[in-house]
């Protein structure tokens, strides 16, 4: 899946779970 283990934000993300962790990573 795309974006796993990479930084993300609430406005822009592409994580497996579709959300960002509190640490700002997928």
Swiss-Prot record:
<feature type="disulfide bond">
    <location>
        <begin position="1"/>
        <end position="16"/>
    </location>
</feature>
<keyword id="KW-0528">Neurotoxin</keyword>
<dbReference type="InterPro" id="IPR012321">
    <property type="entry name" value="Conotoxin_omega-typ_CS"/>
</dbReference>
<keyword id="KW-0027">Amidation</keyword>
<comment type="similarity">
    <text>Belongs to the conotoxin O1 superfamily.</text>
</comment>
<dbReference type="GO" id="GO:0005246">
    <property type="term" value="F:calcium channel regulator activity"/>
</dbReference>
<feature type="disulfide bond">
    <location>
        <begin position="15"/>
        <end position="26"/>
    </location>
</feature>
<keyword id="KW-0638">Presynaptic neurotoxin</keyword>
<feature type="modified residue" description="Cysteine amide">
    <location>
        <position position="26"/>
    </location>
</feature>
<protein>
    <recommendedName>
        <fullName>Omega-conotoxin CVIC</fullName>
    </recommendedName>
</protein>
<keyword id="KW-1015">Disulfide bond</keyword>
<keyword id="KW-0108">Calcium channel impairing toxin</keyword>
<keyword id="KW-0964">Secreted</keyword>
<keyword id="KW-0960">Knottin</keyword>
<keyword id="KW-0872">Ion channel impairing toxin</keyword>
<keyword id="KW-0800">Toxin</keyword>
<dbReference type="GO" id="GO:0044231">
    <property type="term" value="C:host cell presynaptic membrane"/>
</dbReference>
<comment type="function">
    <text>Omega-conotoxins act at presynaptic membranes, they bind and block voltage-gated calcium channels (Cav). This toxin blocks N-, P- and Q-type calcium channels.</text>
</comment>
<dbReference type="GO" id="GO:0090729">
    <property type="term" value="F:toxin activity"/>
</dbReference>
<dbReference type="GO" id="GO:0008200">
    <property type="term" value="F:ion channel inhibitor activity"/>
</dbReference>
<feature type="disulfide bond">
    <location>
        <begin position="8"/>
        <end position="20"/>
    </location>
</feature>
<keyword id="KW-1218">Voltage-gated calcium channel impairing toxin</keyword>
<dbReference type="GO" id="GO:0005576">
    <property type="term" value="C:extracellular region"/>
</dbReference>
